[in-house]
Amino acid sequence: YAEAVAAVMASRRAEGVATGRAVGALVRELVRDVRSTIAGDAPRVGYWDLLIAHDDRTGHPTNLSPSLPPSLPPIYRRLFGEVPLGLSDLYQPRPQLGAPCRKVCETWLNRQRTALLVVGDRGAGKRTLVNRVRAELHGELPVHWLSLGPHLASEARVCAALCEATGAPYAGSFSEFSRLVPLLGGRRVLILENAEQLFVRTPDGLRRMQDFLDLVRATDDALLWVVLIAAPAATLLETCLKLPMYFGQVVRVPAETGTFIETMIRSRHRVSGFGLRFKARRAPALQRLRRPFTRADMLPDPGEEWFVDLERMCAGNLRQALDYWLLSARLDV
Protein backbone atom coordinates (compact mmCIF):
# COMPACT_ATOMS: atom_id res chain seq x y z
CA TYR A 1 0.00 0.00 0.00
CA ALA A 2 2.81 2.43 0.87
CA GLU A 3 4.55 1.72 -2.43
CA ALA A 4 1.30 2.38 -4.34
CA VAL A 5 0.79 5.67 -2.53
CA ALA A 6 4.39 6.67 -3.23
CA ALA A 7 3.96 5.84 -6.92
CA VAL A 8 0.77 7.92 -7.12
CA MET A 9 2.45 10.82 -5.34
CA ALA A 10 5.47 10.64 -7.67
CA SER A 11 3.16 10.59 -10.68
CA ARG A 12 1.25 13.61 -9.35
CA ARG A 13 4.53 15.46 -8.72
CA ALA A 14 5.69 14.73 -12.26
CA GLU A 15 2.38 15.95 -13.64
CA GLY A 16 2.64 19.06 -11.49
CA VAL A 17 6.15 19.79 -12.73
CA ALA A 18 5.05 19.33 -16.35
CA THR A 19 2.00 21.53 -15.78
CA GLY A 20 4.14 24.15 -14.07
CA ARG A 21 6.56 24.20 -16.99
CA ALA A 22 3.72 24.56 -19.50
CA VAL A 23 2.07 27.32 -17.47
CA GLY A 24 5.42 29.06 -17.00
CA ALA A 25 6.11 28.98 -20.74
CA LEU A 26 2.63 30.39 -21.44
CA VAL A 27 3.09 33.15 -18.86
CA ARG A 28 6.48 34.10 -20.31
CA GLU A 29 4.97 34.17 -23.80
CA LEU A 30 2.11 36.37 -22.57
CA VAL A 31 4.55 38.75 -20.88
CA ARG A 32 6.57 39.05 -24.10
CA ASP A 33 3.41 39.70 -26.13
CA VAL A 34 2.19 42.36 -23.70
CA ARG A 35 5.59 44.07 -23.64
CA SER A 36 5.86 44.08 -27.45
CA THR A 37 2.29 45.40 -27.74
CA ILE A 38 3.01 48.26 -25.33
CA ALA A 39 6.36 49.06 -26.97
CA GLY A 40 4.97 48.72 -30.48
CA ASP A 41 7.84 46.48 -31.58
CA ALA A 42 7.94 45.50 -35.24
CA PRO A 43 8.85 41.95 -36.35
CA ARG A 44 12.55 41.30 -36.72
CA VAL A 45 14.23 40.17 -39.89
CA GLY A 46 13.87 36.42 -40.20
CA TYR A 47 10.79 36.27 -37.98
CA TRP A 48 9.36 33.88 -40.55
CA ASP A 49 11.38 31.67 -42.84
CA LEU A 50 10.92 31.51 -46.58
CA LEU A 51 11.30 27.93 -47.70
CA ILE A 52 12.88 27.79 -51.16
CA ALA A 53 12.28 24.34 -52.63
CA HIS A 54 15.01 22.78 -54.75
CA ASP A 55 15.69 19.38 -56.29
CA ASP A 56 18.80 18.39 -54.33
CA ARG A 57 17.49 16.09 -51.60
CA THR A 58 20.87 14.72 -50.56
CA GLY A 59 20.81 16.85 -47.44
CA HIS A 60 24.40 18.04 -47.87
CA PRO A 61 24.53 21.66 -46.71
CA THR A 62 26.74 24.08 -48.58
CA ASN A 63 27.74 25.94 -45.41
CA LEU A 64 30.88 25.03 -43.52
CA SER A 65 28.88 24.26 -40.38
CA PRO A 66 26.49 21.28 -40.73
CA SER A 67 24.25 22.78 -38.03
CA LEU A 68 23.37 25.76 -40.24
CA PRO A 69 20.76 25.56 -43.01
CA PRO A 70 22.12 25.23 -46.56
CA SER A 71 22.97 28.56 -48.15
CA LEU A 72 21.15 29.76 -51.23
CA PRO A 73 22.72 28.90 -54.60
CA PRO A 74 24.86 31.74 -56.02
CA ILE A 75 22.75 31.83 -59.19
CA TYR A 76 19.65 32.44 -57.05
CA ARG A 77 21.32 35.22 -55.07
CA ARG A 78 22.38 36.96 -58.28
CA LEU A 79 18.74 37.30 -59.28
CA PHE A 80 18.26 39.63 -56.32
CA GLY A 81 21.09 41.98 -57.21
CA GLU A 82 21.11 44.70 -59.82
CA VAL A 83 18.87 43.96 -62.81
CA PRO A 84 20.98 42.77 -65.77
CA LEU A 85 20.00 44.46 -69.02
CA GLY A 86 19.46 41.11 -70.72
CA LEU A 87 16.83 39.94 -68.22
CA SER A 88 13.92 42.21 -68.98
CA ASP A 89 11.54 39.93 -67.04
CA LEU A 90 13.16 41.11 -63.80
CA TYR A 91 12.49 44.79 -64.44
CA GLN A 92 9.32 46.26 -62.99
CA PRO A 93 8.23 49.28 -65.08
CA ARG A 94 8.00 52.64 -63.35
CA PRO A 95 6.42 54.75 -66.11
CA GLN A 96 6.01 57.84 -63.95
CA LEU A 97 9.81 57.92 -63.60
CA GLY A 98 10.88 56.57 -66.97
CA ALA A 99 8.82 59.01 -69.04
CA PRO A 100 10.57 62.22 -67.90
CA CYS A 101 13.97 60.54 -68.32
CA ARG A 102 13.17 59.60 -71.90
CA LYS A 103 11.85 63.09 -72.56
CA VAL A 104 15.17 64.61 -71.50
CA CYS A 105 17.04 62.26 -73.82
CA GLU A 106 14.75 63.09 -76.74
CA THR A 107 15.12 66.81 -76.07
CA TRP A 108 18.89 66.57 -76.02
CA LEU A 109 18.97 64.43 -79.18
CA ASN A 110 17.01 67.22 -80.88
CA ARG A 111 19.98 69.53 -80.25
CA GLN A 112 18.46 71.34 -77.29
CA ARG A 113 20.60 71.91 -74.22
CA THR A 114 19.46 69.99 -71.15
CA ALA A 115 20.67 67.68 -68.38
CA LEU A 116 19.07 65.12 -66.06
CA LEU A 117 19.31 64.92 -62.28
CA VAL A 118 18.06 61.74 -60.55
CA VAL A 119 17.54 62.09 -56.79
CA GLY A 120 16.70 59.33 -54.34
CA ASP A 121 17.78 57.43 -51.25
CA ARG A 122 20.41 54.73 -51.54
CA GLY A 123 18.75 51.56 -52.78
CA ALA A 124 15.69 53.34 -54.19
CA GLY A 125 16.42 52.19 -57.76
CA LYS A 126 18.18 55.17 -59.36
CA ARG A 127 20.80 53.05 -61.12
CA THR A 128 18.28 50.53 -62.45
CA LEU A 129 16.09 53.34 -63.78
CA VAL A 130 18.98 54.99 -65.60
CA ASN A 131 20.16 51.62 -66.90
CA ARG A 132 16.82 51.15 -68.64
CA VAL A 133 17.05 54.56 -70.27
CA ARG A 134 20.64 53.82 -71.27
CA ALA A 135 19.54 50.58 -72.91
CA GLU A 136 17.09 52.50 -75.07
CA LEU A 137 19.89 54.86 -76.15
CA HIS A 138 22.29 52.02 -76.89
CA GLY A 139 23.79 52.26 -80.35
CA GLU A 140 22.83 55.88 -80.92
CA LEU A 141 25.52 57.62 -78.87
CA PRO A 142 28.62 56.73 -76.86
CA VAL A 143 27.65 56.29 -73.21
CA HIS A 144 30.21 56.60 -70.40
CA TRP A 145 29.35 55.57 -66.83
CA LEU A 146 31.44 56.98 -63.98
CA SER A 147 30.80 55.83 -60.41
CA LEU A 148 32.30 58.09 -57.75
CA GLY A 149 33.50 56.84 -54.39
CA PRO A 150 36.08 57.51 -51.66
CA HIS A 151 38.81 56.61 -54.16
CA LEU A 152 37.32 58.93 -56.79
CA ALA A 153 36.04 62.12 -55.17
CA SER A 154 38.66 64.83 -55.56
CA GLU A 155 38.38 67.28 -58.44
CA ALA A 156 41.67 66.19 -60.00
CA ARG A 157 40.80 62.48 -59.94
CA VAL A 158 37.29 63.03 -61.26
CA CYS A 159 38.66 65.16 -64.10
CA ALA A 160 41.25 62.50 -64.91
CA ALA A 161 38.49 59.87 -65.05
CA LEU A 162 36.35 62.12 -67.26
CA CYS A 163 39.27 62.65 -69.64
CA GLU A 164 40.00 58.94 -69.78
CA ALA A 165 36.35 58.10 -70.47
CA THR A 166 35.88 60.69 -73.20
CA GLY A 167 39.36 60.55 -74.73
CA ALA A 168 40.09 64.18 -73.93
CA PRO A 169 43.58 65.45 -73.09
CA TYR A 170 44.43 65.58 -69.41
CA ALA A 171 42.67 68.27 -67.37
CA GLY A 172 43.31 69.03 -63.72
CA SER A 173 40.15 71.01 -62.98
CA PHE A 174 36.52 71.20 -64.04
CA SER A 175 37.03 74.56 -65.74
CA GLU A 176 39.95 73.18 -67.74
CA PHE A 177 37.92 70.13 -68.78
CA SER A 178 35.05 72.34 -69.96
CA ARG A 179 37.47 74.10 -72.35
CA LEU A 180 38.55 70.73 -73.78
CA VAL A 181 35.03 69.41 -74.48
CA PRO A 182 34.67 71.20 -77.87
CA LEU A 183 37.79 69.32 -79.03
CA LEU A 184 36.17 65.92 -78.49
CA GLY A 185 34.32 65.95 -81.79
CA GLY A 186 30.92 64.34 -81.40
CA ARG A 187 28.24 64.21 -78.77
CA ARG A 188 28.09 61.66 -75.98
CA VAL A 189 26.31 60.74 -72.75
CA LEU A 190 28.03 60.98 -69.35
CA ILE A 191 26.38 59.22 -66.40
CA LEU A 192 27.79 60.27 -63.03
CA GLU A 193 26.78 58.04 -60.12
CA ASN A 194 27.18 58.90 -56.42
CA ALA A 195 27.63 62.59 -57.19
CA GLU A 196 27.23 63.36 -53.48
CA GLN A 197 30.86 62.24 -53.10
CA LEU A 198 31.88 65.59 -54.59
CA PHE A 199 30.14 67.49 -51.82
CA VAL A 200 31.71 68.15 -48.43
CA ARG A 201 30.16 70.51 -45.88
CA THR A 202 33.04 72.96 -46.02
CA PRO A 203 33.68 76.10 -48.09
CA ASP A 204 36.02 74.06 -50.32
CA GLY A 205 33.37 71.38 -50.73
CA LEU A 206 30.76 73.92 -51.79
CA ARG A 207 33.21 75.53 -54.20
CA ARG A 208 34.03 72.17 -55.77
CA MET A 209 30.36 71.35 -56.22
CA GLN A 210 29.70 74.80 -57.69
CA ASP A 211 32.54 74.29 -60.19
CA PHE A 212 31.05 70.95 -61.19
CA LEU A 213 27.61 72.47 -61.74
CA ASP A 214 29.20 75.22 -63.84
CA LEU A 215 30.84 72.46 -65.90
CA VAL A 216 27.45 70.81 -66.47
CA ARG A 217 25.90 74.08 -67.62
CA ALA A 218 28.83 74.98 -69.89
CA THR A 219 29.01 71.61 -71.68
CA ASP A 220 25.40 70.36 -71.83
CA ASP A 221 25.26 70.99 -75.58
CA ALA A 222 27.97 68.41 -76.34
CA LEU A 223 27.46 66.17 -73.28
CA LEU A 224 24.20 64.82 -71.92
CA TRP A 225 24.84 64.81 -68.19
CA VAL A 226 22.88 62.25 -66.18
CA VAL A 227 23.73 62.83 -62.52
CA LEU A 228 22.65 60.45 -59.75
CA ILE A 229 22.75 61.85 -56.24
CA ALA A 230 21.55 60.71 -52.80
CA ALA A 231 18.56 62.55 -51.40
CA PRO A 232 20.13 64.04 -48.21
CA ALA A 233 22.96 65.71 -50.13
CA ALA A 234 20.55 66.91 -52.82
CA THR A 235 18.38 68.59 -50.18
CA LEU A 236 21.35 70.54 -48.80
CA LEU A 237 22.57 71.52 -52.27
CA GLU A 238 19.11 72.74 -53.25
CA THR A 239 19.33 75.18 -50.37
CA CYS A 240 22.96 76.20 -50.80
CA LEU A 241 23.47 76.17 -54.58
CA LYS A 242 19.98 76.04 -56.15
CA LEU A 243 20.81 72.59 -57.55
CA PRO A 244 17.71 72.07 -59.79
CA MET A 245 18.50 75.24 -61.77
CA TYR A 246 21.41 73.50 -63.51
CA PHE A 247 19.29 70.64 -64.89
CA GLY A 248 16.45 70.59 -67.37
CA GLN A 249 14.69 67.80 -65.47
CA VAL A 250 14.85 66.56 -61.89
CA VAL A 251 13.48 63.05 -61.33
CA ARG A 252 12.88 62.10 -57.71
CA VAL A 253 12.79 58.35 -57.04
CA PRO A 254 10.37 57.76 -54.14
CA ALA A 255 9.89 54.81 -51.81
CA GLU A 256 7.73 52.14 -53.42
CA THR A 257 4.53 50.50 -52.24
CA GLY A 258 4.24 47.03 -50.79
CA THR A 259 2.42 45.83 -53.92
CA PHE A 260 5.31 46.95 -56.13
CA ILE A 261 7.86 45.28 -53.84
CA GLU A 262 5.93 42.00 -53.79
CA THR A 263 5.60 41.98 -57.59
CA MET A 264 9.32 42.72 -57.96
CA ILE A 265 10.39 39.92 -55.63
CA ARG A 266 7.97 37.31 -56.95
CA SER A 267 8.97 38.00 -60.56
CA ARG A 268 12.64 37.46 -59.70
CA HIS A 269 11.89 34.29 -57.78
CA ARG A 270 9.75 33.00 -60.65
CA VAL A 271 12.70 33.25 -63.04
CA SER A 272 14.75 30.98 -60.75
CA GLY A 273 12.41 28.03 -61.30
CA PHE A 274 12.40 27.14 -57.58
CA GLY A 275 9.24 26.51 -55.62
CA LEU A 276 8.23 28.69 -52.70
CA ARG A 277 6.17 28.39 -49.56
CA PHE A 278 5.89 30.60 -46.52
CA LYS A 279 6.22 29.08 -43.09
CA ALA A 280 3.01 29.75 -41.19
CA ARG A 281 3.56 31.25 -37.77
CA ARG A 282 1.73 30.48 -34.57
CA ALA A 283 -0.66 33.15 -33.34
CA PRO A 284 0.68 35.05 -30.30
CA ALA A 285 -0.67 33.90 -26.94
CA LEU A 286 -2.36 37.25 -26.34
CA GLN A 287 -4.37 36.89 -29.54
CA ARG A 288 -5.23 33.28 -28.74
CA LEU A 289 -6.68 34.36 -25.38
CA ARG A 290 -8.63 37.23 -26.94
CA ARG A 291 -10.16 35.10 -29.70
CA PRO A 292 -9.84 31.44 -28.75
CA PHE A 293 -12.38 30.18 -31.30
CA THR A 294 -11.92 32.50 -34.28
CA ARG A 295 -8.45 31.83 -35.65
CA ALA A 296 -9.18 32.76 -39.28
CA ASP A 297 -9.03 36.52 -38.66
CA MET A 298 -5.90 36.17 -36.51
CA LEU A 299 -3.72 34.34 -39.01
CA PRO A 300 -4.00 35.68 -42.56
CA ASP A 301 -2.26 34.07 -45.50
CA PRO A 302 1.41 33.67 -44.46
CA GLY A 303 2.69 35.10 -47.75
CA GLU A 304 0.41 38.11 -47.58
CA GLU A 305 1.34 38.75 -43.97
CA TRP A 306 5.04 38.40 -44.74
CA PHE A 307 4.99 41.05 -47.46
CA VAL A 308 2.98 43.44 -45.27
CA ASP A 309 5.69 43.21 -42.61
CA LEU A 310 8.42 43.46 -45.26
CA GLU A 311 6.97 46.76 -46.49
CA ARG A 312 7.03 48.10 -42.94
CA MET A 313 10.58 46.93 -42.26
CA CYS A 314 12.17 48.27 -45.45
CA ALA A 315 10.06 51.47 -45.64
CA GLY A 316 9.64 51.07 -49.40
CA ASN A 317 13.38 50.81 -50.12
CA LEU A 318 13.92 48.29 -52.92
CA ARG A 319 17.50 47.37 -52.05
CA GLN A 320 16.61 46.71 -48.42
CA ALA A 321 13.62 44.60 -49.48
CA LEU A 322 15.84 42.39 -51.67
CA ASP A 323 18.43 42.06 -48.90
CA TYR A 324 15.77 41.12 -46.35
CA TRP A 325 14.46 38.47 -48.73
CA LEU A 326 17.88 36.85 -49.05
CA LEU A 327 18.41 37.03 -45.28
CA SER A 328 15.09 35.30 -44.60
CA ALA A 329 15.16 32.67 -47.34
CA ARG A 330 16.08 29.07 -46.50
CA LEU A 331 16.47 26.01 -48.67
CA ASP A 332 13.75 23.44 -47.98
CA VAL A 333 15.87 20.29 -47.60
Residue spans of the language-model regions?
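Conserved small helical "lid"/interfacial subdomain of P-loop NTPases
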Residues: 251-303, 312-313
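Conserved P-loop NTPase "ATPase switch" module shared by AAA+ and STAND
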Residues: 177-209
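Extended, charged/polar low-complexity intrinsically disordered regions
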Residues: 1-87
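Walker A/P-loop nucleotide-binding motif
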Residues: 111-131
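Sensor-1/coupling segment of RecA-like P-loop NTPase cores
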Residues: 113, 120, 197-205, 209-241, ...
